[in-house]
Amino acid sequence: MGCCGCSGGCGSGCGGCGSGCGGCGSGCGGYGSGCGGCGSSCCVPVCCCKPVCCCVPACSCSSCGSCGGSKGDCGSCGGSKGGCGSCGGSKGGCGSCGGSKGGCGSCGGSKGGCGSCGGSKGGCGSCGGSKGGCGSCGCSQCNCCKPCCCSSGCGSCCQSSCCNPCCCQSSCCVPVCCQSSCCKPCCCQSSCCVPVCCQCKI
């Protein structure tokens, strides 16, 4: 398994991560600068490229250890998710998403094409499960809203292709959002990200 965390390795199937992975190895012991230094506290010890390294908890727990390394089903998630089930039943279809997919099922079942998103769909559920068409939002580009629709709880988000046609919410767009040249340092409001860019509204 390559740093993309999908069965096809780091090829085009992963959104062409390659160097975008920041040089994190398949074991992701040292994620590299692209990961923000989450290190061992990350629930997904494989790098999921979107196209940068993202150390995203597959479930809602802060670390694999706290999820219960004794859970016994780490292997089924490629060693990335100690206790998905204990984190809200988001164990869904880890294997089918190349091991990096903690919560396919937690997206309400509409997340059927994890593979089409490069298999690096770290935390579908964290976007509220409303992410039906991840491909149309360029989900492989997002390291924030997983797969890429911006929602109130996504935190720092909105890579260059994240919010089209999605809209950012007030808490999503720090430090940048939507298109590469817009809304810095402003946050997008609900109407600003369609269809191309967002104007700063304060």
UniProtKB/Swiss-Prot annotation:
Record-level GO cellular component terms: cytosol; intermediate filament
Function: In the hair cortex, hair keratin intermediate filaments are embedded in an interfilamentous matrix, consisting of hair keratin-associated protein (KRTAP), which are essential for the formation of a rigid and resistant hair shaft through their extensive disulfide bond cross-linking with abundant cysteine residues of hair keratins. The matrix proteins include the high-sulfur and high-glycine-tyrosine keratins.
Signal peptide (residue range): none
Keywords of this entry: Keratin, Repeat
Subunit structure: Interacts with hair keratins.
7 X 4 AA repeats of C-C-X-P: region residues: 48-195
Ranges occupied by Sequence repeats: 48-51, 54-57, 144-147, 162-165, 172-175, 182-185, 192-195
Family: Belongs to the KRTAP type 5 family.
Source organism (scientific name): Homo sapiens (Human)
Organ and tissue specificity: Expressed in hair root but not in skin. Expressed also in brain and skeletal muscle.
The protein's name: Keratin-associated protein 5-10
Domain of life of the organism encoding this protein: Eukaryota
